[in-house]
């Protein structure tokens, strides 16, 4: 259920949620929407594993970020029976605004404090998404998916997967 008590998952068929492979970023770097590549060997390993384990004929959707797109394209090359769809913006990771590409340790303490004190509403990095806006984007994507009857695999990000789980578990209804 969403914050208004509406069921966002009624008649939602099977969805496999896959996090992108390990990325190539410096330790401590703040990134969300930042388009960083996945490590090629990890992308190949993940694609091979998924190709062996996923059922036939799934619809294949992914975030537009290259760390997800690379896996989707490689998986589709190995499994042409998967129905590759254009990237879905709602599957992208949270936009952390002006913090993107900077080291967490170098971010202004006052901004981080303001963010943690109003996590649901404060725009990350001053120009990015609030957690509430991020979850609303995911919820809108889930609502649109209710009309899709095919089983699907979504290649996305850890934050999106957590958000989907929170929404499906109804953990946000009281907040």
What are these regions (language model features)?
Residues 12, 69, 139-175:
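Active-site-adjacent alpha-helix immediately C-terminal to a catalytic or transition-state-stabilizing loop
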Residues 1-14, 52-55, 81, 85, ...:
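Acidic, low-complexity terminal tails and accessory targeting/binding regions
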Residues 47-51, 135, 139-146:
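Generic structural signal for well-ordered alpha-helical scaffold segments
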Residues 22-24, 66-67, 92-93, 158-161:
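Short, solvent-exposed loop/turn segments at secondary-structure junctions
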Residues 13-80:
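Active-site-proximal alpha-helix that buttresses catalytic centers in soluble enzyme cores
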């Amino acid at each position: 259920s969403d914050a208004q008590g509406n069921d966002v998952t009624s008649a939602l068929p099977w969805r496999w949620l896959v996090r992108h492979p390990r990325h190539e970023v410096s330790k401590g770097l703040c990134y969300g929407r930042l388009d960083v590549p996945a490590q090629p060997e990890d992308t190949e390993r993940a694609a091979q594993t998924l190709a062996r384990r996923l059922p036939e004929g799934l619809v294949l959707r992914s975030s537009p970020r290259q760390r997800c797109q690379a896996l989707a394209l490689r998986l589709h090359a190995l499994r042409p029976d998967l129905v590759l769809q254009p990237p879905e913006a709602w599957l992208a990771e949270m936009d952390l605004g002006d913090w993107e590409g900077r080291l967490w340790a170098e971010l202004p303490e006052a901004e981080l404090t303001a963010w943690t004190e109003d996590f649901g509403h404060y725009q990350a990095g001053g120009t990015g998404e609030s957690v509430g806006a991020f979850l609303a984007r995911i919820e809108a994507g889930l609502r649109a998916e209710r009309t899709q009857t095919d089983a699907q695999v979504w290649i996305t990000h850890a934050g999106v997967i957590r958000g989907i789980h929170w929404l499906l578990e109804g953990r946000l209804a009281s907040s």
